[in-house]
Amino acid sequence: MSKLNMTPREIVAYLDEYIIGQKEAKKSIAIAFRNRYRRLQLEKSLQEEITPKNILMIGSTGVGKTEIARRIAKIMELPFVKVEASKYTEVGFVGRDVESMVRDLVNNSVLLVENEHKEKLKDKIEEAVIEKIAKKLLPPLPSGVSEEKKQEYANSLLKMQQRIAQGELDSREIEIEVRKKSIEIDSNVPPEILRVQENLIKVFHKEQDKVKKTLSVKEAKEALKAEISDTLLDSEAIKMEGLKRAESSGVIFIDEIDKIAVSSKEGSRQDPSKEGVQRDLLPIVEGSVVNTKYGSIKTEHILFIAAGAFHLSKPSDLIPELQGRFPLRVELENLTEEIMYMILTQTKTSIIKQYQALLKVEGVGIAFEDDAIKELAKLSYNANQKSEDIGARRLHTTIEKVLEDISFEAEDYSGQKVTITKELVQSKLEDLVADENLVKYIL
């Protein structure tokens, strides 16, 4: 199955392996992502006319909003960034401006493209690294030697390279020259300040500056890999491709959009800068040009997915212009006790499988009786009903509490198989769930 060419049905089938329920949300997002592919198959003139239909997801925390978008972006290898609306401030106030989310997307896109190019050149990079280390370990040939000596040296070099590749010489120490660590740039500042930062770095830090280090062969492989990668990769082409990919197929997931909605219930206590953030966000979602350290990017073809619980506000509390930019709305269902059970038993990388794998490292086998899993689902659901509803995240808390002693004393259980029963789950959790005050603080 081609990742970029996945049909909506294939996308939903993939999501079903990791996320239980939420059929409508999966369907809407699968169509939106498929339309990204469809648009790119059209003539350039028509491509410009078709803009993505942004999505507003409404649902409580822990019901799968972020996970749905993140999983699709990952499988389709699209530039993706998740941000929280509440972290941004209106232009002129202290804090991150909304344009920084686009700069973050471009950074992720360039990194994605760079990793793809590195993967293509993986064998070539490995060969160059091994050859360089082998030449360091073998003394160089003096000038004017016979052809026979040259051939002997070539054979010795080949054997040395084979031994390095097989890891036989990993513990040997060699002295190599490596580049000085580059100075970090804060990419979350306005472009003008970013350019000043880059110019200052050019003045105070020369790229060719190198220092001698004594490293093991294993460490030298990693140090040289990064250096040789930079020489073999076409950084300019990577930047251009990353910029283009972010522009045509980038996805920005804006979580907690409800936190910047101006609720009429809060009246005079409402933070006035919330509406300012919405107005700053509007041109980016509508389509504007944002300057990044890699160049300018147009935002009209970026897919925006906004999500929020909307407990204290309603989608209609967002400014009308912003509401209009999210024409597709999907309401996610709250998790039932049955769905909690299915999350524990039917997902590909369920929480139970994760904990079993973690404790297997210590030589501890963990088995859950079906009744124990049902009890976990029931008590997690009850805890959500009695205190803050945090959806599937509650399962992490309850399982952690049940396995706490086993995890702490793992060496005592090494080589054993521990069975988690319904009675054990009840003894660890039932008193806590029964006490509403304790639920708030412990679960």
UniProtKB/Swiss-Prot annotation:
InterPro entries, A to Z: AAA+_ATPase, ATP-dep_Clp_protease_ClpX, ATPase_AAA_core, Clp_ATPase_C, HslU, P-loop_NTPase
Annotated positions binding ATP: 20, 62-67, 255, 321, 393
CDD domains registered for this protein in UniProt: RecA-like_HslU
Location in or out of the cell: Cytoplasm
Any one of the GO CC terms: HslUV protease complex
Top-rank taxon, per record: Bacteria
Keyword annotations from UniProtKB, A to Z: ATP-binding, Chaperone, Cytoplasm, Nucleotide-binding, Stress response
Example GO biological process: proteolysis involved in protein catabolic process
One GO molecular-function entry: proteasome-activating activity
Family according to the record: Belongs to the ClpX chaperone family. HslU subfamily.
Binding partners and assembly: A double ring-shaped homohexamer of HslV is capped on each side by a ring-shaped HslU homohexamer. The assembly of the HslU/HslV complex is dependent on binding of ATP.
Function: ATPase subunit of a proteasome-like degradation complex; this subunit has chaperone activity. The binding of ATP and its subsequent hydrolysis by HslU are essential for unfolding of protein substrates subsequently hydrolyzed by HslV. HslU recognizes the N-terminal part of its protein substrates and unfolds these before they are guided to HslV for hydrolysis.
Protein name: ATP-dependent protease ATPase subunit HslU
Gene transcribed to yield this protein: hslU
